[in-house]
UniProtKB/Swiss-Prot annotation:
Belongs to the TACO1 family. One of its GO terms (cellular component) is cytosol. Residues 1-20 are annotated as: Disordered. GO terms for molecular function: DNA binding. Keywords: Cytoplasm, DNA-binding, Transcription, Transcription regulation. It is found in: Cytoplasm. Pfam families: TACO1_YebC_N, Transcrip_reg. This is Probable transcriptional regulatory protein YebC.
Length: 246
């Protein structure tokens, strides 16, 4: 779980767990279908679809698979009747948590999310209870690279911020709608990112200790096990030392 970014440990841990469970492609395909249904099949004209395509490619989905998913959405596939639902709540240690879901049955989804919170010492909150603590951003990640070169190209392309971490990794932050454009500009400059995704970035953090960290991880595990849950975002900060024990 040792991530290069102060928020990355959860991102990377989630990707590894979803891949192990064989769920990540199912969730990405669902998002591709829904995004294409709602905004059309052209990623250049549909920021939500472009973000889903970038996520699919970052997770090594083939072009053939993602193109079929887009075609299903444009063609009105049943999966495209899903709606996006955002739940908010509080986890162990006072962590703020946002859960992004795609569902065709709100009652089923909220019951599963509420059950996870009740089992793990958290509370499902009301709309707006924690959303103000997060900002929706595009995050383009380079596991390594020349900081000055990436920063110059990123800022010229319209990025909002560039952050370098102790291990040399670099995160480029963008307005979420501009992530695809910035990534394309970076690639045109010969800078190929390791991943690109839309994320909810917390403005403050809640430090987890040896007691609260495992409880938070259990809650995240339970939420991610819900088929309707697409993403789980939180502001918990876990040190490398504690993370190594989890």
């Amino acid at each position: 779980m040792a991530g290069h970014s102060k928020w990355a440990n959860t991102r990377h841990r989630k990707a590894a767990q979803d891949a192990k469970r064989g769920k990540i492609f199912t969730k990405i395909i669902r998002e591709l279908v829904t995004a294409a249904k709602l905004g059309g099949g052209d990623p250049d004209a549909n920021p939500r679809l472009r973000a889903a395509v970038d996520k699919a490619l970052s997770n090594n989905m083939t072009r053939d698979t993602l193109n079929r998913a887009i075609a299903r959405g444009v063609g009105g596939d049943d999966d495209a009747n899903m709606e996006t639902i955002i739940y908010e709540g509080y986890g162990p240690g006072g962590t703020a948590i946002m859960i992004e879901c795609l569902s065709d049955n709100r009652n089923r989804t909220v019951a599963e999310v509420r059950h996870a919170f009740s089992k793990c010492g958290g509370n499902l909150g009301t709309d707006g209870s924690v959303a103000y603590l997060f900002s929706k951003k595009g995050v383009i990640t380079f596991e390594k690279g020349d900081e000055d070169t990436i920063m110059e190209a990123a800022l010229e392309a319209g990025a909002e911020d560039v952050v370098t971490y102790d291990d040399g990794a670099i995160d480029v932050y963008t307005a979420w709608e501009e992530m695809g454009k910035v990534r394309d500009a970076l690639e045109a400059a010969g800078l190929k990112a390791d991943s690109a995704e839309v994320s909810m970035i917390p403005s403050t953090k809640a430090d987890m200790d040896a007691e609260t960290a495992p409880k938070l991880m259990r809650l995240i595990d339970m939420l991610e096990d819900c088929d309707d849950v697409q993403e789980v975002y939180h502001n918990g900060e876990i040190s490398d030392e504690i993370a190594a024990t989890l």
